[in-house]
Regions:
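Catalytic cores of alpha/beta
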Residues: 125-137, 174-183, 220-242, 270-281, ...
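Active-site mouth loops of central-metabolism enzymes
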Residues: 58-76, 117-124, 168-171, 219-220, ...
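C-terminal helical cap(s) of enzyme catalytic domains, especially alpha/beta-barrels
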Residues: 202-212, 234, 246-267, 300-310, ...
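Glycine/Thr-rich beta-alpha phosphate-binding loop at enzyme active sites
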Residues: 63-74, 80-101, 179-209, 290-294, ...
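Glycine-rich phosphate-binding active-site loops on the catalytic face of alpha/beta enzymes
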Residues: 132-152, 189-199, 236-259, 283-296, ...
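Glycine-enriched alpha-helix->loop->beta-strand junction motifs that scaffold or abut catalytic
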Residues: 87-88, 113-116, 135-141, 161-165, ...
Length: 479
């Protein structure tokens, strides 16, 4: 057994002190009669990730942590679990009370609120904790090799097996990986957090996963803060365990969507059902076009109806006008996208964007569509607009947009990608290449419509597109 890090040692000793209370809490239970679990975390994770399939997620219910303190004051694990059930393959529930604000009541609430397997996230040192975990609804438990000897692990694993509980075996060091393999662990959790000082090393899962057999299920834990990190680590991880990054956000559903799919927009929405399909598929933003000449034009009244029926998208008001953007603002509009023709110079572009910014509420973002195929140098303009800090985001497109036409993506400057959406001719078939460009997000439109029916979104094409987005793993640098 590894020497216990100081932070972990304190938590474990505290948990040992809780054992009498746990025994008393389930003293009325005939543990030999507890039913076996029928929900398998292992089955939900195996065959996922590793660059071959979409990675899985174990999303965690927690209200506080040693590194962050209080994360979520109004903590409702049942409601959180119902959100997670849309995106995850399993749900983890903190049960340690002193540092994480956990309780077995939370475990029972989550187990009753989801169809997914539920992991009891605890610092387990005694079999009574496993009895309690199963009694309150757990389908899997966490066993930490930094806490347990091989003999203790084997004894606790035998208890878990009686209840058909899967085991997430957590490792931090190479020596623990070797022990996990020798002990026959099937699900290996690689914790990026240094339990001495609580620092994060995201390279740990790559190093340690290389030491595991090919059939091991690898779960990357701690420090998974965004979709870019997921894509970077997906080549050697089957799944990701994420908690604080989700429960710390005011809108957990949006945070989960962003973690799983990234930041993407579906433009040219014309009906409530299309907006609902876009959001259900994984979009964060929905584009509403306010242009009479566009086949995707919507009236203010239609826009209001769309927003009312699908309020969980952030809506982008798209227009070619050069003024009057305030007229487009209504409840649900969080962005205006300036699609006006090129203004003739960088100074004129900045002046236009400054005027639009002054014309809309402070909480409404301003995006600029930049043609990468016009007479002007689109790449130079994009760079200049980013340097001027006059926009919140760029939408890099071909021509006037909405034509289904692409452009040469190799011409996109690296220093604008983090603030840019890639648009123009994106279809479910070319999305892997588009994602490899490395822009902040994608802007889908005609490529997810029925052929020859501009403005009519194909819900199955949307779903296929976002399934492709979810599967994407960042290609490894050959160097």
């Amino acid at each position: 057994m590894s020497k216990l890090p100081t932070v972990l040692e304190g938590i474990v000793e505290g948990r040992r002190g809780h054992l009498p209370e746990i025994r008393e809490r389930i003293s009325h239970v005939d543990v030999s009669a507890l039913p076996a679990s029928t929900r398998s975390l292992y089955d939900g994770l195996r065959g996922r990730g590793r660059g071959e399939a979409a990675p899985a997620f174990i999303m965690e219910c927690k209200s506080s942590s040693p590194s962050l303190g209080m994360i979520r004051e109004h903590y409702e694990p049942g409601a959180i679990a119902r959100i997670y059930s849309r995106y995850a393959s399993g749900i983890s529930v903190l049960c340690e009370p002193d540092k994480f604000g956990g309780d077995y009541d939370h475990l029972a609430t989550v187990a009753s609120s989801t169809h997914l397997p539920v992991l009891c996230k605890d610092f387990i040192v005694d079999e009574v904790q496993i009895h309690a975990a199963r009694y309150f609804g757990a389908d899997a438990i966490l066993l930490m090799l930094s806490v347990l000897t091989d003999e203790e692990y084997a004894s606790l694993a035998a208890v878990a097996e009686r209840y058909s509980l899967d085991i997430l075996t957590e490792v931090i060091y190479e020596e623990e990986v070797a022990r996990a393999v020798a002990l026959g662990a099937k699900i290996i959790g690689i914790n990026h957090r240094n339990l001495h000082d609580l620092s994060i090393d995201l390279g740990r899962s790559a190093r340690l996963s290389a030491l595991l057999p090919a059939d091991a299920v690898v779960v990357s834990e701690s420090g998974i803060r965004d979709n870019a990190t997921v894509r970077e680590l997906a080549g050697h991880s089957n799944a990701f365990l994420v908690g604080s990054q989700l429960t710390s956000q005011p809108d957990i559903d949006r945070a989960a969507r962003e973690l799983v799919y990234g930041v993407n927009k579906v433009c040219g929405l014309t009906t409530p059902t299309a907006a609902q399909a876009a959001r259900a598929a994984g979009a964060l933003y929905g584009g509403l076009v306010f242009e009479d000449a566009s086949p995707r034009n919507v009236s203010r009244e239609t826009a209001a109806e769309i927003i009312a029926h699908e309020p969980d998208l952030t809506y982008v008001a798209v227009s070619r006008r050069t003024d009057g953007y305030a007229d487009l603002i209504q409840e649900g509009i969080g962005v205006v996208q300036v699609h006006a023709p090129y203004q003739g110079s960088t100074d004129a572009e900045i002046a236009l964007l400054d005027a639009v910014t002054d014309n809309v509420p402070e909480n409404v973002q301003v995006w600029r569509a930049v043609s990468m195929t016009g007479d002007h140098d689109g790449a130079a303009l994009a760079r200049a607009l980013v340097e001027s800090d006059s926009v919140d985001a760029l939408v890099l497109d071909a021509g006037d947009g909405g034509t289904g036409t692409s452009f040469d993506w190799s011409g996109i400057p690296d220093d604008v990608k983090d603030i840019s959406f890639l648009a123009g001719g994106l279809t479910p078939d070319n999305l892997p290449a588009a994602l490899a460009v490395g822009c902040n997000g994608l802007d889908l439109n005609s490529g997810v419509e029925y052929p020859g029916q501009a403005g009519r979104k194909d819900a199955r094409a949307l779903r296929r597109a976002f399934e492709t987005i979810r599967r994407f793993a960042t290609p490894k640098d050959p160097s």
